[in-house]
Regions:
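Phosphate/nucleotide-binding beta-alpha loop and adjacent structural elements of enzyme active sites
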Residues: 1-139
Length: 139
């Protein structure tokens, strides 16, 4: 199995959750996974190593995370599809707050239910797709 690079202690927590504690435990016959907020690809790597035929659909808006995700998933490019965007209840372009580790963040839209308002370190503008539309397309 390919190893994953952890860039912070937050990434180590995710490694333990996925590969140690098996928080995302799935059967070996899993065939499709949808991962909203894929971060640096650690959970995707877990799913990709459960079944050689699984297809994983990844959604991540943070550029630094996307580069790290691609590095962590080298060799699996034909088994995952990465869409560089956030997922929400409304489509469009929205502000997204993210802190230095890249693990925590969320959409900022004060008047929209289910959007995360935050005063984090960094705010970027990201493309947002509606969760229901994405799931309908995949399933």
């Amino acid at each position: 199995m390919q190893g994953a690079t952890a860039y912070s202690h937050h990434d180590l927590i995710t490694l333990v959750e996925c590969f140690g504690k098996l928080d995302y435990k799935v059967s070996q016959n899993i065939s499709v996974v949808v991962d909203f907020g894929s971060n640096i690809g650690i959970s995707a790597l877990y799913f990709l190593t459960r079944n050689i035929n699984v297809q994983v659909h990844l959604f991540e808006p943070v550029p630094r995370n996307i580069k790290r995700l691609r590095d962590n998933l080298k060799g699996y490019e034909n088994r995952y599809k990465l869409t560089e965007c956030a997922i929400g209840t409304k489509e469009g372009k929205f502000d997204f707050s993210c802190e230095d580790s890249g693990r925590y963040g969320g959409l900022i839209e004060k008047d929209v239910e289910n959007f995360h308002g935050s005063s984090s370190d960094r705010v970027i503008t990201v493309k947002v797709l509606m969760a229901n539309n994405v799931l309908r397309e995949i399933c």
